[in-house]
Amino acid sequence: MRVVLLGPPGAGKGTQAQKLSEKLGIPQISTGELFRSNIENGTKLGLEAKRYLDAGDLVPAELTNQLVDDRLSEPDAANGFILDGFPRSLQQAKALHEMLERRGTDIDAVLEFRVSQDELLARLKARGRADDTDEVILNRMKVYRDETAPLLDYYRDQLKTVDAVGTLDEVFARALCALGK
């Protein structure tokens, strides 16, 4: 099963991706983790990404796409994966489609984790990160909405909405149900 998780910062995508990965026996692929592991391992792409990150710049989409494409080529992803944090834009969604088309496959499901803005604010403030001021959090939510709205339409045929308010187990049960598991 090939699954994309969408949702704003604080919706619990990473936590649910980990639980789904364990339950379904397929890898969780997080762009943040791809950056970290490639940088730690000193790969060519990792070193290139590090240059951007060290300068405080965003890593170009083409570089992120290449990291994801390389990761999807690994044997453990042959029978499925859970993408957490990718795609973030329509351009990346189209690039992902091309990556999978070359492999003769496609996305099976897209789960959108939905949480109210008030709940997200409360969750993100509770994390206690120094940079999580109301202004920063609200801006991250706006960026998410602006970038993700086109993705919801792009994936409309595979899209399932999951109410992400509740205990971890309640949200997990809803996610499994949305996947038909």
UniProtKB/Swiss-Prot annotation:
EC number(s) on file: 2.7.4.3
CDD domains: ADK
SUPFAM superfamilies in UniProt: P-loop containing nucleoside triphosphate hydrolases (SSF52540)
Compartments where located: Cytoplasm
An example Gene Ontology CC term for this record: cytoplasm
Keyword Ribonucleoprotein on entry: no
Keywords, comma-separated and alphabetical: ATP-binding, Cytoplasm, Kinase, Nucleotide biosynthesis, Nucleotide-binding, Transferase
Chain residues that bind ATP: G10, A11, G12, K13, G14, T15, R127, G166
GO BP term, pick one: AMP salvage
Quaternary data: Monomer.
Family that this chain belongs to: Belongs to the adenylate kinase family.
Protein name per its UniProtKB record: Adenylate kinase
Organism placement in taxonomy: Bacteria, Bacillati, Actinomycetota, Actinomycetes, Mycobacteriales
UniProt gene name: adk
